[in-house]
Amino acid sequence: MDKIIARLAEVNDSLKGVIDIAHFNDEAKIGKGQEMVDKLTKLIAIFQRPELNFSKNKAEGDDIIGDAYEYLMRNFATESGKSKGQFYTPAEVSRILAKIIGIDKCTDHDATICDPACGSGSLLIRALSEASFEISGYGQEKEVSTAGLAKMNAVLHNKATIKIMAGNTFSDPQFTKENDSSELERFDYIVANPPFSLKNWSDGLKEFGRFSGYGDRPPEKNGDYGKYYYTVRHA
C-alpha cells in the first residue's frame, strides 16, 4: 500500500508530502501481525462498499468526492472534541465569512486571497468558490499533518493550485515579499478562523513590522490581537 501511494505522489507534485506521510505498516498505530492485517482488511473493505460508488449518481456540477472528504473531516472534528475541531470551520460559517469579504464582487483576475490559519482549508476553499473566476489562494497552517489535510482538501475540490504551507504564522511566516524576505506579502483578501485565546503565542516571534504603529505588543497570554495585527499587515 505504501509503495502504491508513493507512486501516486511521485507523479503528482501537489500530493507530495501529503498522501505519502501516512504509513500503512506503522505498528505503533495499527498494531502488529494479525492485528495489522485485520485492521487494514476492514479499512479497504469500507471503500469497496457499493454505496460508496458515486459514478452513476454524479450530477453535473456536483463535487461529491470533495463533499465526502469534508463530511469525514467534519465528523472527525465533532467526534474528537473541541481541541481537535479547531482545524475545521463549519460550512455554514465558511459561507458567511466568504460573503462578508465580498470576493464574489472581485473583478481583478490577478487578485489574491490568504488564510494565515487555514486548518484543513475548508474556509479558504469556500471563499475561492465564491469568486466568479479562478484567483490565487494561499494558506498557512501550524500543524504539518493538518496542512496535509488542507492540500488534499484542495485537490479534491479542484483547487490544486492553492499554495498551502506549514509553519507558525508568528514565528515562521511563509509568505513574504520576493524582493524583501523581511516584509510580509500583501493580499487582496484575508479570511481566517484562527484559534482564539492562544497562550504563549509570542514564543519565537519574529516581528516583520507587524506591530509597529499600534502601540505595545499584545499580551503574551492572549494572542487574539496578535492575529488581528498580523491580518492587517498582510492586507
Where on the chain are the PLM-derived regions?
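Alpha-helix N-cap/helix-initiation motif
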Residues: 38, 42, 83-86, 135, ...
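A mobile, often basic/glycine-rich helix-loop segment
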Residues: 202-221
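Short, structured coil/loop segments at alpha-helix boundaries
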Residues: 8-15, 37-40, 58, 143-144, ...
